[in-house]
Amino acid sequence: MKKQAFGIGIQLVGIIGIGSLLSGCDFRMSVKDRTGETQEYTAESAAAPNTLPLEVVKYQQLNTYQIGKALYDMSEEQVDDYLQDQGKDPSFYLGVGTNGEGFYSINSELGDYYTTVLSTFSDDRTLDSYFSAVDIGDTSIDAIGAQIEQCLKDAGFLIAFCEKYALCAEGLNQLQKDLYDEEEFKLYAPGAEVDENGMQTGELNSWGEADEAYLFYYYMAYHNTYVASVSGRNRIQIVYSPSKHQVVYGNGNLCPILTQEVVSSKEITSLDENEAIALAKKALSEAGIKDARFVSAKPVYVNNFGDISFEDQTMTLVPAWRVEYTVEKNGKTIRNWLHLNAETGEVYDNTIKL
């Protein structure tokens, strides 16, 4: 069989995320009534409108052969041979899952370690607190990220932007110590000693240079506009090991291949940039976050699980504002954001607890 891209010896599993939706105020009121203030706050740039229409768009179903060709340069015969060698059901592996929504997942023998690490991050503990986008050894994080992004584009995915982190040993070990001090919880690092039940034993295991990896988050786009999901599962997550020269973990949820076929399109009356920032400021204040510094407000699309029709293979894209802000935490500047419905001001909360 032809060698796979990036030396990937992987299995692909279809996954889908369930969306959640929280709202923060009565959307029948005016902006002034809801915020309790006039629009005195001025954005860093002039107040701009959100001109995105509400659209219902067809998305494309990918099959296992398309994925195999686009990502791994495999013929249909090679895909069949691979699946037979692995003993896997083609409706679950190397493809898009049983419903054909365009979702997939990657895993390898190291995947569980990084899954455990990434599962520890939440509102109180952020990736920014431990990791940054630095090169590991002589391997460029930018070059690797660009190669993976090109593979995703070849498969038909539209990428809005990418976030990059280097999961370095120093940060991994600091996270390990913090978790153990707070919760007596040990991260599953490669090489850890375990008992007959699979539980770690002995001292805190140490992460070394061979365990270091790059983490990439690729966010979806439609016509070069970011598509956010209120469930937070609007991105493809990839972990790449420089020492092994291969992808070792990744998954994609709510990441369809959007087509150019528009089923319906509707213009809306949108809040402007300053109105969106004022509502975000109010929501954060009510959540106890009063020291936020607002960085930007950008027009985006929002989609949730209820806006996907698997029968018709359509997705409803709702115009929204993405308001980015920063807060100071433990001496570091942490970036976060809120999404608001561009027409009603409804707050979609997929990043913090309001």
For every predicted segment, state its role.
Residues T98-E101, E109-D112, A210, V239-V247, ...:
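Short, solvent-exposed coil/turn segments at beta-strand boundaries
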Residues K329-L354:
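Acidic, serine/threonine-rich low-complexity disordered tracts
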Residues Q147, C151-Q237, P242-K329:
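Segments that shape or occlude catalytic/ligand-binding pockets
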